[in-house]
Curated annotation (Swiss-Prot):
Glycans are attached at N201, N235, N523, N924, N951. The lineage of its organism: Eukaryota, Metazoa, Chordata, Craniata, Vertebrata. It is a single-pass type I membrane protein. N-glycosylated. O-glycosylated. O-mannosylated by POMT1 and POMT2 and elongated by POMGNT1. The gene is Suco. This is SUN domain-containing ossification factor. Residues 55-64, 206-218, 240-252, 271-286 have a biased composition (Basic and acidic residues). The keyword Transmembrane helix applies. Residues 283-452 form the SUN domain. Residues 55-75, 116-302, 527-547, 581-602, 742-769, 1148-1168 are annotated as: Disordered. It is found in: Rough endoplasmic reticulum membrane. It comes from Mus musculus.
């Protein structure tokens, strides 16, 4: 506890001294640091994206290295008590206290940025460092912190920082705690400035991606989780830097936030939105900001105007060309094998329609074809419309006889009139050509310019740029040379004070020949604390060192810096240097990055040398601390190389330890030489000797293991290098891995670098230490830088240069503390002389070893990086090489001065970080507000659109429902109608069916009736036919043949006589057919008239019978009326027949041959013949059947009558012939000559009067 209190007291005194000692220097440091800080912030912004991407890769690599670092850190922690003793030995100067205070606020600014839990712990460590003056840091005992660190397995950066800070607090408990921690940050701040500068350069050169602070923090937290070692602390510190830069980037990207609203439908998350905005802003800022610088501005314009608007890809086309031209569109295609072919003898011209109206800035024309003539002079005309007769001649361009792309940029002054015109059509006319070939092909033509949109964006961006210029500059927009310029300005501000400090650094370097190791321990602890303060990196390094020793080292280191830069030389705290070594390597790449700007590195180196000589002599503690930090860094790099070389033997556990003890001795001597530090330093050195002796073994083993892990990685990168080289490369590789978790890599680098630098410091502890150490340091630092560059290249592969810059800066910061730590270890192990002797050998070895490492790392970097970042890295490497040569030519003090300037810049960079963080917070607030406004607007719009759509939908639904209801009603009505119609139809159909059934029944009945009637008719017809057949069958055919064939009718008499003979009772078979048509009226027909209808056929039997009884049956027909002769001879019956047999009464026509009554004396035969004749009359039947047999008297009377009538018969015959001449005669009737149809019955008859 006493040690802790002493250390705290020393630190507080140093901080007070730093504040009070040299205000002018403090101001200068602030300015330089601010410049570096601002530049660093810019680089951080650029580096954030790369770091974010690379952190993940490196975190994976760093996990093994973190374990190694944890082991190393444990060893460092054990060694740290000695450092604490040394710190106790060192008296705290007020100047140192002031310096620490100054650095403290810077450190506080760093921890202000909150990472994830692990990063937060790191931040806490840095904050405790910053607030080391406060009791919070002192409250936590280093032992408890160490325990926690040991428990954690991986030394989380925050915890080690906290541990170291409490130790410092305990030591400085007597003295103000704030001062001691502040001193450590102050010392650390210079490395941060270096780191910031390197990072800035790297970020500017390599910053391709930009990541939001939250994203970067998340990535950093992941990396920290992967390795909780001091490397993670370093990573967190870098993360803080990156965060500050990130905040700046959001501000820069503010104008681009408008881009996000372009997608109103898609509402991205804040991180996505911010990332997009930052990326857009980054592109714009990269193109716009360099405009302030002539060269970069041209580059910016080229970048902005690198759109070829005469390309087929964007829609350009050939509108017209000379008719001989072939494949005219080939000139718009980026294909070397395609070309427009024209004979040289023709007039070659063509018109191109560009993709869009642009302000023409440049023309490119090319002819790749061999054995052809290339264009020499060509006229270019422009127009805003086509076709046109007013082509504006832009000018005649003269080409070269080359078969490649020839560019013709337009001078804005000469073509100011045309450059501002927006044209879309270009006419090119080839006026002449080189050579005498037949063909003049043209392979390519390009037109570059600015479109209306780009011009508008430039104006808007320029306005926004003017508003946000500071923020952009701070973030990442400064060119690689920016830090150099700032450094120069800061250097100028430092002035003679810086030179005095540099001189003091030189003196300290001489002292460091013997005591550098002690100072190195103090510086190491201080740098570690500073690293933790600056970022978790410092915390990391502090954690690595033993809690108590590290505060002591910090106090000692701060005090030493305040007193003498030599006191804070690297040799002391090798354990911390190991942690710092990784950081140093990373930091060295950062430094290389700064150097990458070439001019910056060279100028800074020369300036540092001069200023270091001037200022270090006067302002040894403060300015030398900053310059000395770089100086320590170089020594650390040298010692790292030596340690790498020795790490092989160190793995065995022997070679590594002896050189460190030797280093410790020189540190003691240095501390003794220092007025205040000597006593405290001696004690602390003893402490450190013991602790370091033990820790060096552990550290050597751990360091070896860590190096082994690095070797594995390095084998891939540099398998050909020897183990030492591979170790150094591994350290470099480890920083890369650590760059993923920056803390881990930085810690391992610190420890390793710490050993080697301490050894180098021990070697240079002699009076020659200044020159030798400077040279060696320069060589080793350059080698280390090369390795760092290699690391950086790898880091660039894994991460963006921004991340590498942060890592490198962190490493540099850590390396300085590491350099401080190794001396105590060496002191404990070996006397000063031994340490010095060992150092030279180690330094030489390191030089040899590091030199190869440098070379290989450079080519590897070149191989690894092919991008502009690679070019930057190569430039940085060349710059580093030049810078290294300059450093060799110059003294180490000069380089230390450069580091000093960086340190001062770093201090200011811390303040600037705070400012940047504030601005970043403002930017974030503005972005958040803008994002919220955008979200609210989008939400409002979406809600309005949704509401409108909903209303429309409701209206449509209502309309649809109303239409549907109407349709339903109509359909319902139609259905009802259809149903009614259906019922009616059903009824109709049923009625029809019933009616049809009835009709069917009626028809069937009728049909049945008809059938029945037909049947009856048929039956009746058949019956009639049968009867007819029977009747006809009774007649005998002979009867007809027997009839007389005389043409004359028998006389009536004969007939009557024959009638007398007939048997009247016999019925005739054929009665006379009655016919109304043949009825004789009483007027016309007399009873005496006789109508013969048809001959009666009598069967022979009947004839015989009739003849037989003829005499007996013949009756005399007496007319009822007497016949009165008429004048014309007609005879009229007086009376109608009264007899029933009379014709009148009968009403029937009898067809028969009328014969007069037979004469009484006629024979029987004659009577028979007459009878036969008479029988032909239809009335015969009635006569025959109706007459009764007459008596003889009647027969006689009849005969007399017949005789009388015989004459009358003739008369009647004549009458009949005359009156009814149409009537056929009986003979005719018999013969069938004539037929008479009577009535419907078709009876043939003859009508006539009898």
């Amino acid at each position: 506890m006493k040690k802790y209190r002493r250390a705290l007291a020393l630190v507080s005194c140093l901080s007070l001294c730093s504040l009070v000692w040299l205000p002018s220097w403090h101001v200068c440091c602030k300015e330089s640091s601010s410049a570096s800080t601002s530049y660093y912030s810019q680089d951080d912004n650029c580096a954030i994206g790369s770091e974010d991407t690379q952190f993940q890769k490196k975190n994976e690599r760093e996990e093994p290295s973190n374990a190694e670092l944890s082991g190393k850190s444990n060893s460092y922690l054990t060694i740290s008590p000695e450092g604490n003793k040394i710190k106790d030995d060192y008296t705290v100067d007020v100047q140192d206290l002031e310096t620490t205070k100054l650095s403290l606020p810077v450190v506080e600014a760093l921890p202000t940025v909150d990472l994830h839990e692990e990063s937060s712990s790191v931040v806490v460590g840095s904050e405790t460092i910053e607030n080391s003056s406060s009791s919070s840091t002192s409250e936590r005992t280093p032992v408890s912190e160490l325990d926690e660190v040991e428990k954690s397995g991986t030394l989380s950066i925050a915890k080690p920082g906290e541990v170291e800070q409490p130790e410092a607090d305990c030591d400085a408990g007597e003295a103000p705690d704030a001062d001691a921690p502040v001193e450590q940050p102050a010392f650390v701040s210079p490395p941060e400035s270096l780191v910031g500068q390197h990072i800035e350069n790297v970020s500017s050169s390599h910053g391709k991606e930009k990541v939001t602070k939250s994203e970067f923090e998340s990535k950093v937290s992941v990396s920290e989780q992967d390795g909780g070692d001091p490397k993670s602390a370093l990573n967190t510190s870098d993360t803080l830097k990156n965060e500050s830069s990130d905040y700046t980037k959001p501000g820069e990207t503010d104008p681009t936030s408008v881009t996000s609203p372009k997608d109103p439908e898609d509402i991205p998350t804040f991180d996505e939105w911010k990332k997009k905005v930052m990326e857009v802003e980054k592109e714009k800022s990269q193109s716009l900001h360099p405009s302030s610088n002539g060269g970069p501005h041209a580059t910016k314009k080229v970048q902005k105007n690198r759109n070829n608007y005469a390309s087929v890809e964007c829609g350009a086309k050939i509108l017209a060309a000379n008719p001989e031209a072939k494949s005219t569109s080939a000139i718009l295609i980026e294909n070397m094998d395609l070309y427009m072919l024209n004979p040289c003898s023709t007039k070659i011209w063509f018109v191109i329609e560009l993709c869009e109206p642009i302000q023409v800035k440049q023309f490119d024309i090319a002819n790749y074809e061999l054995f052809s003539s290339t264009p020499k002079d060509f006229l270019v005309s422009i127009s805003d419309r086509y076709p046109t007769n007013k082509w504006i001649k832009l000018g005649t361009f003269h080409g070269r006889d080359e078969r490649n792309v020839q560019s013709f940029p337009l001078d804005e002054q000469m073509y100011a009139k045309y450059v501002k015109m927006f044209i879309k059509y270009i006419k090119v006319e080839l006026l002449s050509h080189f050579g005498s070939e037949h063909f003049c092909p043209l392979s390519l033509i390009r037109v570059f310019g600015t479109s209306m949109v780009e011009e508008y964006e430039e104006i808007a961006d320029s306005q926004y740029q003017s508003e946000r210029q500071e923020l952009f500059d701070e973030d990442y927009d400064y060119p690689l040379d920016y830090n150099t310029v700032e450094d120069k300005s800061s250097k100028n501000l430092l002035g003679s004070a810086t030179n005095a400090i540099l001189n003091m650094v030189n003196i300290a370097a001489n002292i460091l020949g013997a005591k550098t190791e002690d100072l190195t321990e103090g510086n190491k602890s201080i740098s570690e604390n500073a690293t933790a303060t600056t970022e978790p990196k410092m915390t990391e390094s502090t954690r690595v060192s033993t809690p108590v020793p590290s505060p002591e080292y910090v106090i000692k280191e701060v005090h030493t810096h305040d007193r003498e830069p030599s006191t804070s030389d690297p040799p002391k705290e090798s354990p911390i240097v190991q942690l710092v070594q990784e950081e140093e390597e990373e930091a060295s790449p950062s430094t290389v990055t700064l150097l990458g700007s070439g001019e910056q590195e060279d100028e800074s180196s020369s300036w540092f040398e001069s200023e270091t000589h001037i200022l270090c002599s006067e302002l040894t503690s403060i300015c030398c601390i900053s310059s000395f930090s770089e100086y320590i860094y170089k020594w650390c790099s040298v010692r790292i190389a030596l340690y790498r070389q020795r790490s092989r033997t160190v793995s065995k556990g022997k070679d590594f330890v002896p050189p460190q003890p030797s280093l410790l001795l020189p540190v003691e001597s240095v501390e003794v030489s220092v007025p205040q530090p000597p006593s405290g330093d001696v004690d602390s050195e003893n402490m450190e000797r013991e602790a370091e002796t033990v820790d060096l073994d552990d550290l050597s083993s751990v360091h070896q293991g860590h190096l082994i892990n690095h070797t594995v990685d390095t084998i891939e990168l540099e398998p050909s290098y020897p183990q030492t080289l591979s170790q150094s490369l591994l350290l470099d590789v480890t920083p890369e891995m650590n760059s993923l978790s920056k803390v881990e890599g930085s810690e391992s680098v610190k420890s390793e670098g710490g050993y080697i630098p301490s050894q180098l410091m021990t070697q240079e502890s002699s009076v020659e230490f200044d020159d030798k150490t400077e040279k060696k340091t320069e060589s080793f630092s350059s080698a280390e830088k090369l390795s760092v560059i290699y690391e950086t290249s790898k880091v660039n592969e894994v991460m963006d240069n921004t991340v590498k810059e942060d890592i490198l800066s962190t490493e540099v910061v850590t390396k300085f503390p590491e350099t401080v730590v190794p001396p105590p270890m060496n002191t404990a192990t070996v006397p000063e002389g031994e340490s010095v002797e060992t150092k030279p050998s180690i330094a030489d070895t390191l030089k040899h070893t590091v030199t190869p490492v440098m070379d290989p790392s450079l080519p590897e970097v070149k191989e690894d990086e092919q991008s502009p970042e690679d070019a930057l890295l190569r430039g940085l490497q060349r710059t580093a090489t030049d810078f290294y040569a300059e450093l060799q030519n110059s003294t180490d003090l000069g380089y230390g001065n450069g580091n000093l300037v960086h340190g001062s810049n770093q201090k200011e960079s811390v303040f600037m970080r705070l400012n940047n963080r504030i601005k970043a917070l403002e930017v974030n607030m503005s972005l958040s507000g803008r994002y919220l406004e955008e979200l609210s607007q989008r939400y409002r719009k979406q809600m309005e659109e949704m509401q409108k759509a909903f209303n429309k939908t409701i209206v449509k639904l209502q309309n649809t429902s109303r239409i549907a209801e109407e349709q339903d009603q109509r359909q319902t009505e139609a259905i009802h109608l259809l149903q009614a119609q259906l019922t009616n139809m059903t009824q109709l159909v049923s009625n029809l069916s019933a009616t049809v059934a009835e009709l069917k029944r009626e028809v069937s009945d009728r049909q049945s009736y008809l059938v029945m009637s037909l049947v009856l008719c048929v039956v009746l017809g058949l019956m009639l036919c049968m009867q007819r057949c029977r009747t006809t069958s009774q007649f005998d055919g002979d009867y007809i043949s027997k009839l007389p064939k005389s043409n004359q009718y028998p006389s009536p008499k004969r007939c009557f006589s024959s009638y007398d003979d007939m048997n009247l009772k016999r019925r005739t078979s054929f009665p006379l057919i009655r016919s109304k048509s043949l009825q004789f009226t009483g007027k016309e027909v007399d009873p005496n008239d006789l109508y013969i209808v048809e001959p009666l056929k009598f069967s022979p039997e009947k004839k015989k019978k009739r003849c037989k009884y003829k005499t007996e049956k013949i009756e005399t027909i007496k007319p009822a009326d007497p016949l009165h002769p008429i004048a014309n001879g007609d005879i009229k019956g007086r009376k109608p027949f009264t007899n029933q047999r009379d014709f009148s009464n009968m009403g029937e026509v009898y067809h028969s041959s009328y014969k007069g009554p037979p004469s009484e004396g006629s024979s029987e035969t004659s009577s028979q013949s007459e009878e036969s004749y008479f029988c032909g009359i239809s009335a015969c039947t009635s006569l025959c059947n109706g007459q009764t047999q007459k008596t003889k008297t009647e027969k006689r009377a009849l005969k007399r009558r017949r005789s009388k009538v015989q004459d009358q018969g003739k008369l009647i015959k004549a009458l009949i012939q005359t009156k009814s001449g149409s009537l056929p005669s009986l003979h005719d009737i018999i013969k069938g000559n004539k037929e008479i149809t009577v009535g419907a019955f078709g009876v043939t008859a003859v009508s006539g009067h009898i």
